[in-house]
């Protein structure tokens, strides 16, 4: 084959391959156009997806045209449904661990806030841990003196449940040294109390924006629950105290809708004392178990109806649940009057289960150490001492502190009842330990259909820290 023939042959083969390649592309395009419509598609694929970028949720509308994606960012639709929360409480046979933040252990080498008064509240899609920071970090010089309750540096912040109160994931909620927070199904409402003791102000936030205020009406440390408020069918309820901690004070229940106060009522409770109520929804009413800081070692009970009418008294059970307290055997109980003469006290909680009651208390009678929850038969309505269940959460060789209640809404659990849950604060540092600071972590438990073994989910931080040795 001469050179000219070789050139002609190679050229013919190349041209054939080019023609074949073009034919294959034409066949591919023809099949794509003919086949896709038969599958009910017009050649484009529209899809709306939700993507999370750190703590920001962005909704994207993605239009696919063959091999090309067109992405449009669209505004996140606002949930327009309020939570109902009129369901009864689920019956709990025991309480299983839900979360533990280990904030102080992590804080020895991590950027974790010095906190007190942590509590949990839930929306239809998540539960969050709220806490009052001291404007300082664990193991830092600014943590000195944080045993003090009220200062201009204290703020209410929150993280997703189970996270430590760290600077990277915490969300600012309000300036506050006393607080409450709850979700109505649409947005979070938070209430932060701050300012001087004689002229404190409570600022109501809704969806992160200040919407209303409550000024101190008695001029003596206006304060609120330090646990979740309660929303029922779009209306949210909470309790506030103004007045002495060791004598008769003044108490009010408030109701708000979308962050605007629409009602309040004075709670008449002569001879009784109400502080730091732990409240939850149950069958369309708000049931609260509170702290008597004046005389009673039994806990005040407040039941609030939607029209702000109320019933107030004491937890009937024949066992005391405040600290300090006397011997169980010497306590008789009362549904109407404070019993015992110990004074002081600690925030606590209880759950009504029909006529029975689950009530939490420290194991120690004299100090904030250990924690147990007891079920007392007929303890909501009678001076019963019949203890039918007991579960240890923190053993008596470890510190506890405040405790409080919240519920898991049916939107989260898909049940037809509200799951009762509680948290236990575990205070470390001053005044019981040799440190320059005071902070806490928490364990969270939720009601289940099974009995749960005793154990100690204590704080576990090894003290003192480096800052305490300087």
Language model region names:
Residues 8-16, 21-39:
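Alpha-helical transmembrane segments in eukaryotic/viral proteins
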Residues 61, 71, 112-113, 127-133, ...:
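Short beta-strand elements that form the blades of beta-propeller/WD-repeat-like
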Residues 65, 150-155, 167-174, 212-220, ...:
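Beta-propeller fold detector
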Residues 100-126, 131-133:
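Beta-strand-rich domains and repeat architectures in extracellular enzymes and scaffolds
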Residues 110-119, 170-182, 220-230, 271-279, ...:
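Repeated scaffold domains used in trafficking and secretory/extracellular systems
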Residues 135-156, 197-203, 246-253, 296-303, ...:
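Structural motif
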Residues 258, 320, 376-381:
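Short loop/turn segments immediately following beta-strands, especially the blade-tip
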